[in-house]
Amino acid sequence: MRKMSIAIVLVLVSSHAIANDDLMTAARQVFKPIPSAIPAVKDNPVTVEKAELGKMLFFDPRLSASGIISCNTCHNLGTGGVDAGPTSVGHGWQKGARRAPTVYNSVFNAAQFWDGRAPDLKAQAKGPVQASAEMNATPDRVTSTLNSMEGYVGKFKQAFPNDTPPVTFDNFAKAIEAFEATLTTPAAPFDQYLNGDVSALDDQQKAGLKLFMDKGCASCHYGLNIGGQDYFPFGVVEKPDTKLLPTADKGRFAVTNSSSDEYVFRVAPLRNVALRAPYFHSGQVWTLKEAVGIMSEVQLGAKLSEKENNDIVAFLNSLSGRLPKIDYPILPTRTKETPPPSLSK
């Protein structure tokens, strides 16, 4: 009898190991771990000098017309690369139309912004600084501000030694792109799991991973960034209410002017998703549990049980990686030539 009990235990343990191996194999076919090395950026080699300059620019509010809004205002590196409100507040207390996307791991996205209107981080960096509802500056104002401070001029010369002049709006964007390329978050429990550590996820997280794949979540949220690669309508099966999907915001339609792109958005990357509530482009959902329930119904037509929802949320918590250590930079001192703040619209 004792031998039979031991045999049963061994069979169960063996079955559990096989199930774990099958799950890991299936996951590796869909997802990739974030590399520990800084990724290469097309047509913009990332150097220490360029990334350091980009960090200064990222944190400098004087590049906005008001002198009080920086990139970090809306993409706060201390709060998951996003701000705390449903949508960002910009120049003259104007409210943005959409939730600020996270800057962490954005280098791995196929395109930038919810509607994918920027093909890369360089193009993205040029957008908010000029947007009237965000930083409300102009390329001339940006370069005039930078040229007015010798500390910046010297940094641009170091970062772009072959360019004359070194301070240009294009180089401003390249430096920010280089810095943002360093904002990756490797070594999440899920990364460790994909790299072969079966114990990196607990049983509930593994159950959530299996559900995430079996229910169809991974059809959109796949790859290295677990999203950020494709475009889909918000409301494939059932259209959300107007609180979640405001009728005035037609998503990618504004970029392509194609009726097939109405209410189509870039799939949100899910890395560090537990760190950056509220959720969706409208920023109206404050818990992962509610977000998972909504997505399962409107995108997949599935009604999750309480346990299924909790298991998927547990898996999503395993996507939080190691945040880079960021020291707040000391910025160059303004001079009498530095343009004064302008609060007018």
Model-derived segments and their meaning:
Residues 20-127, 191-294, 300-302, 327-345:
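Short glycine/threonine-rich turn/loop motifs
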Residues 14-16:
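N-terminal signal peptide c-region/cleavage motif recognized by signal peptidases
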Residues 2-9:
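Sec-dependent signal peptide recognition
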